[in-house]
Amino acid sequence: MASGVSGYAAISTRVRAMYSDLLSPQEMTRLSDSPDVSSLISSLKNTPYGKYLSGLKDNELTPRRAIQQIKHRLADSYSSVVQQAPEQTRPLIKQLYRYFELGNLKAVLRSIQTVSSWNADTPAWDRVREVLFPFGSFTSIPAQAMVETGNVASAIDLLRGTPYESTISFAARRVSTEQSLFPLEVALDLDYWRKLWAEARKLAGKDREMAVKIIGSLLDMNNLMWVIRYKIYHKLSEEELINYTLPFGYRVRDEDVRAIAAGSDIASLISRIYPSITNASALLENPQSGLPKLEHA
């Protein structure tokens, strides 16, 4: 027990230090007032992001390159937290961090599907790696090898032995039939959140209570956004809506998702689950602008 307490003390100190490095609203305003990208990056060099940007040469000062360097700071922060986390909670923290690898996997597969439209003078991997999260030694996917296959089916074969093998192998059949990555990406999302929820529920005592509340609240909003977007934009059937969402959460129940899938009024259901959201109907009138606001309400 003592080691667990000291472990939390160490990670708490580390996270508090990270909070102190966050940019203040005033700093964000000053940055947003920068006249051009070069001035913005120059200003960022005087913030905690500076050491990640200081190595950029003038001809490398592009928004994409700067964003990639800034991602390295987030990667270093996550890596530090993972390594300092108490043993019993480390699997949960690692799975949280794997969210970025999931994004990388989707980006790799999408790039393979669209590479034919790119400038042939630039190697595909050089284009793709600029948008990937720098997952470092934690990565389990052979991103470069996948991109260089130039074929989705061949890239999927390279995922054997990774945490994604069973999920992606099953969904790959539909990708081949429908010529779309949509069912595969949905399957990967669901698998990620199932595993994260399972890790939260493996914990005991106060750890479990807090993890279930935090992870469950994230899962609730994801589930709601999925079912609303699938219904509004993808026009999925009731059965598909249920299959493409999760039957558990913190406040959003399986019957809530099923009710939306069956045609119940979405706004009234949101208002019941989240009483503080009083303008759900107005937000849903224009989903394109309203859903992002609802997601962060």
Model feature map: region roles:
Residues 1-297:
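N-terminal domain-start signal
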